[in-house]
């Protein structure tokens, strides 16, 4: 399947890439096998994310989220339709956000997401209070030390490689004296494990940043909670004309981070 995606990326038109804003040049690329839980009641889904390290920025995005987006744009720009896209049979992406650190300026990070509209929000990069732990291991030939912290109501164990002196990691996890190659939350609802490293990549770091509605992380959290617990209310909030199934079971959203401790109907 990845060979098909690589072929499509080679024939993508200039118009598709024109939708992307270049923000840096990629020096290193890290691929991670991931597990994401969308709701408390179901098991995690497998996916893959990419972490790109630039000169002064770092960006995380879903491998299949980006690949599917580019493939869809390419098909449409060449006169195809949705049926042509679905005929590819690509995996459904569970992670579609972009997390961009030191954008739009140093010390801030921006997140793009989609809930009926294309949203973007920015927030300060938070310093994590890491604690060193016993349990060192080896990942892809790198000796990795173990550390732990609690970040926005979720506790994490991570393993970082001091031989890769980059204080970054997947998603919003960062701040250690080495690249985080593995991260698992203590509830086993989310995990990231590095499966590939590329050096001297030298390609544009880019993302779709134009024509997005500015919002706040708290508002996005409320949308994600409603999506699982009250889908009808969620559709009304995002202004969707589609009706929900009244028999749809209500579930509890499982989020990577929690800004609010209690659910809200707003």
Question: What do these predicted regions represent?
Answer:
Residues 1-25:
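Bacterial Sec-dependent N-terminal signal peptides
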Residues 20-266:
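Extended soluble regions of mature proteins
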């Amino acid at each position: 399947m990845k060979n098909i995606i690589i072929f499509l990326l080679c024939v993508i038109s200039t118009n598709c890439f024109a939708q992307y804003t270049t923000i840096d040049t990629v020096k290193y690329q890290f691929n991670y096998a991931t597990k994401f839980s969308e709701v408390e009641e179901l098991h995690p889904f497998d996916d893959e994310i990419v972490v790109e390290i630039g000169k002064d920025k770092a960006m995380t995005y879903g491998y299949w989220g980006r690949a599917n987006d580019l493939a869809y744009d390419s098909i449409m720009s060449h006169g195809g339709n949705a049926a042509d896209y679905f005929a590819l049979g690509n995996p459904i992406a569970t992670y579609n956000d972009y997390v961009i650190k030191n954008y739009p300026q140093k010390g801030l990070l921006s997140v793009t997401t989609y809930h009926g509209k294309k949203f973007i929000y920015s927030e300060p990069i938070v310093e994590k209070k890491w604690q060193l732990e016993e349990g060192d291991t080896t990942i892809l030939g790198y000796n990795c030390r173990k550390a732990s912290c609690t970040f926005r109501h979720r506790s994490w164990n991570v393993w970082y490689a001091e031989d890769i002196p980059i204080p970054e990691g997947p998603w919003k996890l960062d701040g250690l004296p080495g690249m985080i190659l593995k991260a698992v939350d203590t509830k086993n609802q989310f995990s990231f494990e590095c499966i590939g490293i590329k050096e001297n990549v030298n390609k544009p770091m880019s993302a779709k940043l134009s024509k997005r509605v500015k919002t706040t992380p708290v508002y996005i959290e409320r949308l994600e909670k409603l999506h699982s617990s009250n889908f009808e209310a969620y559709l009304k909030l995002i202004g969707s004309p589609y009706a929900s199934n009244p028999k749809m079971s209500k579930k509890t959203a499982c989020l990577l981070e929690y800004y609010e401790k209690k659910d809200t109907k707003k």
